[in-house]
Regions:
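Conserved structured core elements
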Residues: 218, 239-242, 273
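Long, low-complexity intrinsically disordered regions
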Residues: 211, 225-230, 234-240
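DNA-binding alpha-helical recognition surfaces that contact promoter or target DNA
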Residues: 226-227, 247, 277-278, 289
Length: 302
């Protein structure tokens, strides 16, 4: 999809020359006098347990562009074949992102700063997939982007050049798909009860206690927490909070009118102030602002 939006119409909701990713499944671009394309591609059925989607993001940002993104509970493998860009989080100085990298879980909003040609292709991976591919301890990848050259068995330069030189979207996605397929034996052999725990939390939209997850899988809480840190990178409690935030964001984004008390009950918050506090921990606006922004954006997206 291509978005062409004027920030003049959105000035009450957002500063110019910025984009915000709205939850795990919704990215909108609102930049003055610019055209951006962000397109998702679904994996083949064999890969759906391990891959959420593929994506291609292309465009131009001659005057500079900031992208803010909240946590979404996924990992990613990314190939940047455009101009270099930087990333920052928690008021840390921006750092240049590797041209090919793996990222783990993010626990707070991060900001990308781009200028020039934007050309990025990537894979959004399910929470356990990186560990199942490489055996990595995922707690070491939290809030970070590790160059693919650190991971064994990957012909990084060949892959990066192949993605860059392939002109068709379908060709780029095929390269990424074949890469994951080549790791399927390793991925499947490393599936464990923690993969089941992640799936159960996802099914519950994060509205589940750690004790209930452990009881459901007939394992101890201590074992669940220890192995979850290894395979996912964060605690099961924190992961559930991220999933609840994602489900909540999706609910707010797609309702014309909101019954806040109903949402408080549905997502197991103590009260509305608890909901707002939790939402703002993962996003940089409150739920009402988020709802207004999404309604405004849907009026202008073509």
């Amino acid at each position: 999809m291509t978005y062409k939006l004027s920030t003049k119409k959105l000035s009450s909701c957002a500063p110019p020359h910025k984009t915000r990713e709205l939850g795990a499944n919704h990215s909108f671009l609102y930049i003055q006098s610019a055209i951006m394309r962000y397109q998702k591609f679904q994996p083949v059925s064999e890969l759906k347990p391990f891959v959420e989607c593929y994506f291609i993001w292309e465009g131009k940002a001659h005057s500079g562009l900031q992208v803010q993104s909240p946590p979404n509970a996924f990992c990613s493998m990314v190939f940047n074949y455009g101009d270099p860009y930087t990333a920052s989080q928690n008021n840390a100085p921006p750092m240049e992102v590797p041209k090919a990298f793996l990222s783990g879980q993010f626990t707070a909003n991060y900001t990308l700063e781009l200028k020039g040609m934007i050309a990025v292709a990537g894979i959004v991976l399910k929470p356990c997939t990186v560990h199942n591919m490489f055996g990595s301890r995922m707690s070491e990848l939290v809030n970070s982007r590790a160059a693919l050259s650190f991971f064994p068995g990957l012909p990084v330069d060949i892959l990066w050049s192949a993605v860059k030189n392939e002109t068709a979207d379908e060709g780029k996605i095929k390269i990424l798909e074949q890469l994951i397929i080549s790791y399927l034996p390793a991925i499947k052999s490393n599936i464990s009860i923690i993969d089941e725990a992640v799936e159960y939390i996802d099914t519950c939209k994060g509205c589940i206690s750690v004790e209930a997850v452990a009881e459901k899988l007939n394992i101890s809480r201590r074992y669940l927490e220890k192995k979850f840190l290894e395979k996912v990178g964060v605690s099961p409690k924190f992961y559930a909070r991220i999933k609840r935030f994602g489900a909540l964001s999706n609910k707010i984004a797609h309702q014309e009118k909101i019954d806040w008390q109903e949402i408080v009950l549905e997502f197991d918050f103590h009260d509305q102030s608890h909901l707002v506090k939790e939402f703002m921990e993962f996003n940089q606006m409150n739920p009402s602002q988020y709802h207004l922004l999404h309604r405004e954006l849907t009026r202008f997206v073509k």
